[in-house]
Every structure is written in C-alpha cells, then in structure tokens.
C-alpha cells in the first residue's frame, strides 16, 4: 500500500529527484534517501497539528474547572498555533442553559479572578484541583461505560462552562471550534436551531471569536439516539446554521463539517449527499479516523506497517468524493487518534503510540489533509496527550517537537530500494520561527519499525551540510510501553508548573549518516541547506 502511495505521489518526479551517488550499494542497515526539492508538493495550515477537548468533559461541568490550571494552559500554549475543537459524541447530548448557575468549583475559580486580564489571573485553587482529581477516576468510569453501552443522557452546560472553554483557548493561543448539538430535532426531523441561537446570542454578547461545527459522526446517530438523518437533511441543517450565523455577529465565522466517521459504505453515501446539499456552506470538510478498536488492539498492531498503511486508503476515499462533488474544498481530519473507544489501555498513552501519530501526520501532509486534530489533549480515556495529573505523555512531547521543527511546506522524500514500509520518511521545509534555523533549511522526520538501527544517507548535495538530530526513545524499564520519553538521552519533563523544557538538539559531524535505532522515531534538521522551495 505504501509503495502504491509513493508511486502516486512521486509519479514522474522520480527522474528529477536527487538520488544517492552511483555505486553506493547499501548494506541492510545503510539506507539511501531520495528527496524531491524543486518545488513544494503542497502547503498545510500553520495550525496543521491541532487538538481537541472532548465534549464529555462538560457532562459534569465541574470538571471543566481543570481548564483553569496554569500547568495545563502552559502545555496547550506549547502547541500554538492550533485549533481547539470542543466536540465528540457528547456534542449531541449537551444543551446550553443560559440560566443555569455555575458549579461551586467554577464559582470558586471565577471569584479568584480579580485581574481584568483573564490570562494573567489567579490559578484554580490547589484544594479545588485536588478534590476534582480525586473524583475524576469515578467520572471517567461513568463516561467510558456510557460510551461502551452507547446509552447517552442529555446534560446541560452554563454560561460559565462556555467562558471556561473560551478562556482556556484564548489564553493558550488556540482558536476555538465549538460543536453544536445536531440531535435537537423538530417533529419532522429538521434541526431545531433554538438552543444554538441562545448560545450564539450569549457568545456574541461576550465578543467571543469562535468557529462552529454541527453534530458528531452523523453516520452513527441511529446507534446513539435511534434517530436517522440522511445526508440531504444534514446538508440542509448546515445551510440553516449558516443562515443563522449570517444573521448574527458570527457572519464571518468559519463552519466545518460534517465530522463523519470512517469512510465506509453508507457513510460515504451520506457524505456524498451531504456535500451536494450543504457542501457550499462549509469552509472545510471534516472526517474522523482511528486505526483500531481500543478494546482489542495489541502492541503488535501499534508497530505494524500494514496497520499504518490502512490510513492511506481511507484518505484516498475521502479525497475522491470531495474532489468529485466540491472540487477545491479543503479536507481536515476533525478527530483522530490511535484507537477508538477512548484508546487502547496501556498502549495509546505510551511511547508505542507515537509511531501511529507521527506516521499519520506525515501521510496527512503528503496526501493533502490541511489540518489534523488530535483526540484528545486532556480528558477521559487512554489517548490523551496530557494525563489526569497534568503530566505530558510521549505523544505530547512528539507533538511539541513537530510544532517547533516542522514547517507547513511539504516536500517529497523516499527510501531507495524495494522495502520501504518499515522505515517511513517525511520531508518538510523547517519551521522558520525556530530561532536556530532559517529559510531554506529542511526537516526530515523518520520512524523505524525495524528491529535494527538504520543509518540514513541524504542525497549528495546535502551530504556535507550540518545536521541537528532530535532522537526520541522511551525511558525506563517499560520500553516501548513507557509513559516517559527521552530526547537525545535526556528525559523530558516540565521545569516547573508553567515552563516547558528546552528541546536541545544534538549536532552531527558533517557527512555523518543519520542513525535511527530500532523502534524509535526522530527529526533531523539539515541546516544551511538553501533549498529554493523553502525560501
């Protein structure tokens, strides 16, 4: 599958590619790379890597108070610029109640905010946080049971809940995308927009800058709520929401959707009819992807190149339908992680999950996905970037490195030779906002699924350029199942409650091969490359 993708991407460019020198037949562990750097393949959004807060966090709004934690905000700020999507299954079971009083935890937080600058205000009290953290495991069990049994109850959220979400996004440098309840229906199954109107009125009165979605995975509405909505009706609902936005202070707000699940059978049919009825009013098409069922996924699945390759076909299906019906429409991964159902216990929150995450980012950029929203930044389940104690997990550090080193311009790279599936390489122009690097530099990111170290040789014009290595490996006795990660041999952890550590490079001697140990991943920045496509 990966070979077919490379043929599709590389096409006639192979003849133009800069290859390794003739006569350098590689041994098993020395690999020659090819780069095509004449022009960018495409550009992705500066917010390409984005994050989500699952709507389930608002089921009991007390737990939204977590978002007042300065530590959590500092971690989110590290991933800016990014979108923050508030959505998920519970989107369609949350109802805004403007008359609902804040919880005691929310009141405690807001009363402490004596500073008019909310982003420089007092943190949530330690006592409140401790109380919530003690109660969170029980709430998490309730949420996961609800998800497994597919028996969802409506909940209400208040103005205070909206304020907490918005202040978290604003103070973290994130752009909030808010998912509206699509299961509020009239007797003839049209969308009932009255509750959305109440929320729009409130957000308008506060001057909030928010983008919007409507519903979550409409292909599974029947399973979740025994309501069947086809693509035509859903498209008409989006047109109605667009009209609502046009009549409000949100006339310039963005609208995204339909947030369908995996592109199979009836879901693809729903997408087609949705795009025909409502495709013109959305700014980007959103869909969701997970590789595996979290309840049965194995470590071997997480390290399988065949599993990674399944993503390619899903992307191709989505792009094909989009191009046919709404050519030129941008496509986003509106929600994605390793395994659905909250992730795979003892896997989705470990170093092993990084292979799926980094490969998905690389393939998405290559194939034309403009934004990838990681489920979830913080919340229930096992696929979060930050755990219940506000400790960053391996995928957080991987995401942070990606943000700092990888720019939006996408280039082509590939491994020379027949077997490319277990050594997966991706190439971008370097992020020019990194103080150490400049226009024209290259960032190569690689994952090695072989059980031996691989030594990579870049094409000859770049072979003598200085290279900085950022190698990620698990830390501690748990190996690939570790929740701790080291960068170039140093364990990554926060310096204090609001300070991220320096991500220190390891410079290589000029002309060195780029070594990547077995079952590891990392980034190589080729400095002073002076690549025209990156200038």
Swiss-Prot record:
One of its GO terms (cellular component) is extracellular matrix. Keywords: Calcium, Cell adhesion, Disulfide bond, Glycoprotein, Hydrolase, Lysosome, Magnesium, Membrane, Nucleus, Secreted, Signal. Glycans are attached at residues 192, 209, 451. Residues 519-535 are annotated as: Required for transferring proheparanase to the Golgi apparatus, secretion and subsequent enzyme activity and for enhancement of PKB/AKT1 phosphorylation. Heterodimer; heterodimer formation between the 8 kDa and the 50 kDa subunits is required for enzyme activity. Interacts with TF; the interaction, inhibited by heparin, enhances the generation of activated factor X and activates coagulation. Interacts with HRG; the interaction is enhanced at acidic pH, partially inhibits binding of HPSE to cell surface receptors and modulates its enzymatic activity. Interacts with SDC1; the interaction enhances the shedding of SDC1. Interacts with HPSE2. Optimum pH is 5. It comes from Mus musculus (Mouse). The active site is at residues 217, 335. It is found in: Lysosome membrane; Secreted; Nucleus. GO terms for molecular function: cargo receptor ligand activity; heparanase activity; syndecan binding. It is a peripheral membrane protein. Expressed in skin, mainly in the stratum granulosum and the first layer of the stratum corneum in the upper part of the epidermis. Also detected in hair follicles and in sebaceous glands. The lineage of its organism: Eukaryota, Metazoa, Chordata, Craniata, Vertebrata. Proteolytically processed. The cleavage of the 65 kDa form leads to the generation of a linker peptide, and the 8 kDa and 50 kDa products. The active form, the 8/50 kDa heterodimer, is resistant to degradation. Complete removal of the linker peptide appears to be a prerequisite to the complete activation of the enzyme. The keyword Chaperone does not apply. This is Heparanase.
């Amino acid at each position: 599958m990966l070979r077919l993708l490379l043929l599709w991407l590389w096409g006639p460019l192979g003849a133009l590619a800069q290859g390794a020198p003739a006569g350098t037949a590689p041994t098993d562990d020395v690999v020659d790379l090819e780069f095509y750097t004449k022009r960018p393949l495409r550009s992705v959004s500066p917010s390409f890597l984005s994050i989500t807060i699952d709507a389930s966090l608002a089921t009991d709004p007390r737990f939204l108070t977590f978002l007042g934690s300065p530590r959590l905000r500092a971690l989110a700020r590290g991933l800016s610029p990014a979108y923050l999507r508030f959505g998920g299954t519970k989107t369609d079971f949350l109802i805004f109640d403007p008359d609902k009083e804040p919880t005691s935890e929310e009141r405690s937080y807001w009363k402490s905010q004596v500073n008019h600058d909310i982003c420089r205000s007092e943190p949530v009290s330690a006592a409140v946080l401790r109380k919530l953290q003690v109660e969170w495991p029980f709430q998490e069990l309730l949420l996961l049971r609800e998800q497994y049994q597919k028996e969802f109850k409506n909940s209400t959220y208040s103005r205070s809940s909206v304020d907490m979400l918005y202040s978290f996004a604003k103070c973290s440098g994130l752009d909030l995308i808010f998912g509206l309840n699509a299961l509020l229906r009239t007797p003839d199954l049209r969308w009932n927009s009255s509750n959305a109107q109440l929320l729009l009125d409130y957000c308008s009165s506060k001057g909030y800058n928010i983008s919007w979605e409507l519903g979550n995975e409409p292909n599974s509405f029947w399973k979740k709520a025994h309501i069947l909505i086809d693509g035509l009706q859903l498209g008409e609902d989006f047109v109605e929401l667009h009209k609502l936005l046009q009549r409000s202070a949100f006339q310039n707000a963005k609208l995204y959707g339909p947030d369908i699940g995996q592109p199979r059978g009836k879901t693809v049919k729903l997408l087609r009819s949705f795009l025909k009825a409502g495709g013109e009013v959305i700014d980007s098409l959103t869909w969701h992807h997970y590789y595996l069922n979290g309840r049965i996924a194995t470590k071997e699945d997480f390290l399988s190149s065949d599993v990674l390759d399944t993503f390619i076909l899903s992307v191709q299906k989505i792009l094909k339908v989009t191009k046919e019906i709404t050519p030129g429409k941008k496509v986003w991964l509106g929600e994605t992680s390793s395994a659905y159902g909250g992730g795979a216990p003892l896997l989705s929150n470990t170093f092993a999950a990084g292979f799926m995450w980094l490969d998905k980012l690389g393939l998405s950029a290559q194939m034309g996905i403009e934004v990838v929203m990681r489920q979830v930044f913080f919340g229930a389940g096992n696929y979060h970037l930050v755990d219940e104690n506000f400790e960053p997990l391996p995928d957080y550090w991987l995401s942070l490195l990606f943000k700092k080193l990888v720019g939006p311009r996408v280039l082509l790279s590939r491994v020379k030779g027949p077997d490319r599936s277990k050594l997966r390489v991706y190439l971008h122009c370097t992020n020019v906002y990194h103080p150490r690097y400049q226009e024209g530099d290259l960032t190569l990111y690689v994952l090695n699924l072989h059980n031996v170290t691989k030594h990579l040789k870049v094409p000859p014009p770049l072979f003598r350029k200085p290279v900085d290595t950022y190698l990620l490996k698990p830390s501690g006795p748990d190996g690939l199942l570790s929740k701790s990660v080291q960068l170039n041999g140093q364990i990554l952890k926060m310096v204090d409650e609001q300070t991220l550590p320096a991500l220190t490079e390891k410079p290589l001697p000029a002309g060195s091969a780029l070594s990547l140990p077995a079952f590891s991943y990392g980034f190589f920045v080729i400095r002073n490359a002076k690549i025209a496509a990156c200038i």
